[in-house]
Amino acid sequence: MKIGILSQFPQLYSTQRLVEACQSRGHEAVVINTLNCYMNINSIKPSIHYEGTELVGFDAIIPRIHASVTFYGCAVVRQFEMMGVYAANDSISIARSRDKLRALQLLSRKGIGMPVTGFANKPNDIPDLINMVGGAPLVIKLLEGTQGIGVVLAETKTAAESVIEAFLGLKANILVQEYIKESNGSDIRCFVVGDKVIASMKRQGPEGDFRSNLHLGGCGEVVKITAVERKMAIAAVKAMGLVVAGVDILRSNRGPLILEVNSAPGIEGIEQTTGISVTEPIVEYIEKMVAARKTNRPIIA
């Protein structure tokens, strides 16, 4: 097969590991900078062009769309879909997961556990919003934030009101979320492919920081997840419609809670922490799906 890897960063560990996984299974891997693609949208033969050349002959793509280019990245993925190319994560599912509010609403609809979350537009709703999520301390998140950036822990009601007022004054969209104190600055990252959790690790934030993102200095360790956590991670990925995803889970006194579903999860941290390859299962899943599409067989993931 000819597999395109949509990534702005060809030298990144994640990109290189995907290339290696494709090649090790006998496939041609082509790294494509998403932002260098341009499209011919017509009713006869839609096409994608890249640095002066039409991209043809692809069986599948693996989107690694950075959050900062979600709109354009989804347009490129959608164009590949229109050309009949299989996308490991389709454009609609990527867009769903990137919209934090929509993602939480989808999880809510499926009855999947998550921290109580509030969303408002007017400053005069702030006191009720704070009470709605259980009062301070609470977490305030920018909807557009990624990798722990734009996330604030407000220790008191006064601090929460000040931060929320400041964000709303800047016309920023924010979520107000209950603080799960018992998680103690840690979460569990599950790497899911299809209907399987391939690997999982516990991420612990640095001393004094409630955010556990490895990009912010957190550290990872191997963790054994429960059957409930495994089932919940897979259900969260299915709620988004994704195939490949990282699911972040908080352990709370009332059971596991989904914090986020990431459509382009980091590969380096979880592979180096667990010693488990997560890239080969991605390619194996693509092989199965492409073969099923060619023979029109029912797809059993």
UniProtKB/Swiss-Prot annotation:
Positions with a binding annotation for Mg(2+) 1: D248, E260
Keywords of this entry: ATP-binding, Ligase, Magnesium, Manganese, Metal-binding, Nucleotide-binding, Protein biosynthesis
Cofactor mode of binding and number, as noted: Binds 2 magnesium or manganese ions per subunit.
Primary enzyme class: ligase
Pfam families, per database record: RimK, Rimk_N
Gene Ontology CC annotations of this record: cytoplasm
Needed cofactors: Mg(2+); Mn(2+)
Family of the protein in this entry: Belongs to the RimK family.
Protein's UniProt name: Probable alpha-L-glutamate ligase 1
